[in-house]
């Protein structure tokens, strides 16, 4: 569930990190949240965007929602003309100053540990950063320098 705020919201989902973000977005749409929202969804290949049609539908139906899929390992078979590279770097290219935003990050430990400090360095307030890292069985939760922890 989103905090009660007027700040624009940036979601960064790495691969299956889309699942918890999907839940938050569906709740926001149901409650009629009108704040600007962007979803940066990073995957390796085009076929990994497993519910792309749903996210595209949201972008058509909700003028305050914007979708930015990002492929990190695009191949010729992907026939991809969209954004490429690391998902958090794509977001930072579009939003170089994160002050006045809320950011929700969901994905692998490695992605969260790379993204959160980069976002804080770009002006994101500690109390406006929320993350949920997917830990392999037997692994440990990440310890980024800042952020609120679990979404």
Model-derived segments and spans:
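Fold-independent oxyanion-binding glycine-rich loops
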Residues: 14-15, 43
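Internal, well-ordered alpha-helical scaffold/interface segments
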Residues: 19-26, 53-56
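FAD-binding FR-type
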Residues: 1-11, 23-30, 45, 71-73, ...
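Hydrophobic/small residue at the entry helix of a nucleotide-binding pocket
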Residues: 16-21, 111
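Catalytic cysteine-centered active loop of the rhodanese-like fold, especially the PTP/DSP P-loop
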Residues: 10-13, 105
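Reductase modules of NAD(P)H-dependent flavoproteins
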Residues: 36-151
């Amino acid at each position: 569930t989103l905090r009660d705020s007027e700040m624009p919201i940036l979601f960064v989902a790495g691969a299956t990190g889309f699942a918890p973000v999907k839940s938050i977005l569906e709740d926001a749409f149901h409650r009629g949240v009108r704040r600007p929202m962007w979803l940066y969804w990073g995957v390796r290949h085009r076929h990994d965007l497993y519910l792309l049609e749903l996210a595209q539908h949201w972008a058509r139906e909700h003028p305050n929602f914007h979708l930015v899929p990002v492929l990190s390992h695009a191949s010729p078979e992907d026939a991809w003309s969209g954004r490429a590279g690391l998902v958090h770097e794509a977001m930072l290219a579009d939003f170089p100053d994160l002050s006045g935003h809320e950011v929700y990050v969901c994905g692998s430990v490695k992605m969260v540990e790379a993204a959160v400090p980069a976002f804080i360095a770009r002006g994101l307030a500690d109390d406006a950063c929320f993350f949920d890292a997917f830990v392999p069985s037997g692994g440990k939760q990440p310890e980024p320098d800042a952020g609120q922890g679990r979404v």
